[in-house]
Amino acid sequence: MSFSEFYQRSINEPEAFWAEQARRIDWRQPFTQTLDHSRPPFARWFCGGTTNLCHNAVDRWRDKQPEALALIAVSSETDEERTFTFSQLHDEVNIVAAMLLSLGVQRGDRVLVYMPMIAEAQITLLACARIGAIHSVVFGGFASHSVAARIDDARPALIVSADAGARGGKILPYKKLLDDAIAQAQHQPKHVLLVDRGLAKMAWVDGRDLDFATLRQQHLGASVPVAWLESNETSCILYTSGTTGKPKGVQRDVGGYAVALATSMDTIFGGKAGGVFFCASDIGWVVGHSYIVYAPLLAGMATIVYEGLPTYPDCGVWWKIVEKYQVNRMFSAPTAIRVLKKFPTAQIRNHDLSSLEALYLAGEPLDEPTASWVTETLGVPVIDNYWQTESGWPIMALARALDDRPSRLGSPGVPMYGYNVQLLNEVTGEPCGINEKGMLVIEGPLPPGCIQTIWGDDARFVKTYWSLFNRQVYATFDWGIRDAEGYYFILGRTDDVINIAGHRLGTREIEESISSYPNVAEVAVVGIKDALKGQVAVAFVIPKQSDTLADREAARDEENAIMALVDNQIGHFGRPAHVWFVSQLPKTRSGKMLRRTIQAICEGRDPGDLTTIDDPASLQQIRQAIEE
């Protein structure tokens, strides 16, 4: 079957299509209804069926290939490596499941996980899935008041954390941040379970705090039966990053999530049992949830949990892992590749990467210079894919198992099965033509694996995502265009639009142009208020040649050259009013550019919540650049 036929069947006959894909996982009780869409926009998949994520990820493969590698935990920060076969992982998950039950955690209870990228984090999430508890991972980069808000929203029965994590040689004091968060929260968890890594001193709270290792010793050899869950019971809550005010918890189911991930591993990611999948993300983000915690294991692959940066202790660290563990498939974000692009390629090519078959990139738009560089350097297909926290798996990609069309630089590919993607005119709501920019939406119902609702707030779910044009379309909040061959291009957020004297431009379009200039390593473009034009674009550039930063005359020449390039590629209306050169740009710890923060600084406004920022010194660089 061609991909076109596969895709059209998913749109024209969604129930028959997804009933077939559901055979990829084990069901204890068969489902009686593939889709219940009687209360749009809410969609319920595989109704009446019972299954379990942990069973499908661990037990199923323990029975088929007990001695195959399942979990590889690597920390370049502490120079530790631990490996678990499927048999060993099964044993550890049962122990932790018994620990959770001993602390009174029941089916449907929330367990908040605030942990570094260590094996215990992965095992804890699988243990939650085993007993039917709902896990809610809070990214380790969040500060205390943000953690407190998530505690109050999820109301966990238990919090699992650690003394500390590490990043770039710096210790991140998780326990101290967590203590501060609990002090600020209204909801008080009964217990806090702590992994003591010996990285930071902890203040223990009697009666509340428990040592992970001590409790583990009490449950060695435990066997905990799987809780068979109705497909639409909640598996997890994952809060979207950068949220202000009340957190927005994306709620996901059990059966639909398992089926979607299992299908994606086969058709999109080419996962084969016995292989090794290295997703260089964090379990606190959706990419980590889907493609570290669950999807590789669902496919019978080993999954790598990595603590550290791509450049610490040196920029060869990822490639050492690829070589040592014979990684077949790798998943990262364009930001990490841009960082690596600044270093000599010899530090990559010195490693035997012959096992690597493909690199997948997602999380932000992939610019053409970065795509070209990494494709040439690694010598393997580089496959962009586009999705969101809310979708849980790719909305757009290239399904290599079914589709041999070539990648197109700058494009995340074509809509994936189940996603009835449309581009609509922002004013009329009518479909856009070829190469016509529009708002990217998805016709309901959303396919399996996507957001069920916002935790505890159905009304907010409907208002936030389903209120465009009085139609049953899900708003992605992204601009896009489609070319004559059906490839899509993402042009940036609908709220990252610059209106320059009546010309509406996505920041992505200007960034793409500037990125093609030879001396540009990375760029961020924002729109700021202007008395004459309403808004103007300004650009902050990290140059490849750092002497640009020291020589004002050289910087002025480079600025003029970049402006001329934008004039030529987009038009004079797209030309930035200023191009400033900096050595770093404000980003979250997951690599997302903080464009709104940059914009606020440029306009003299309060930049707001900065709890997720990686390096606060980058803000000072922005301030200094605009003052000079």
Curated annotation (Swiss-Prot):
Keyword ATP-binding: yes
InterPro entries per UniProt: ACAS_N, AMP-bd_C, AMP-bd_C_sf, AMP-binding_CS, AMP-dep_synth/lig_dom, ANL_N_sf, Propion_PrpE
Gene Ontology molecular functions: ATP binding; propionate-CoA ligase activity
Catalytic activity line of the entry: propanoate + ATP + CoA = propanoyl-CoA + AMP + diphosphate
Gene Ontology biological-process entries: propionate catabolic process, 2-methylcitrate cycle
Disulfide bridge map: none
E.C. no: 6.2.1.17
Gene3D superfamilies to which the protein is assigned, alphabetical: 3.30.300.30, N-terminal domain of ligase-like
Pathways per UniProt: Organic acid metabolism; propanoate degradation
Annotated keywords: ATP-binding, Ligase, Nucleotide-binding
Enzyme class: ligase
Keyword field contains Metal-binding: no
Source superkingdom: Bacteria
Family: Belongs to the ATP-dependent AMP-binding enzyme family.
Function description: Catalyzes the synthesis of propionyl-CoA from propionate and CoA. Also converts acetate to acetyl-CoA but with a lower specific activity.
Protein name as catalogued: Propionate--CoA ligase
Species, as recorded: Salmonella typhimurium (strain LT2 / SGSC1412 / ATCC 700720)
The organism's taxonomic lineage, starting at the top: Bacteria, Pseudomonadati, Pseudomonadota, Gammaproteobacteria, Enterobacterales
Gene name of the encoded protein: prpE
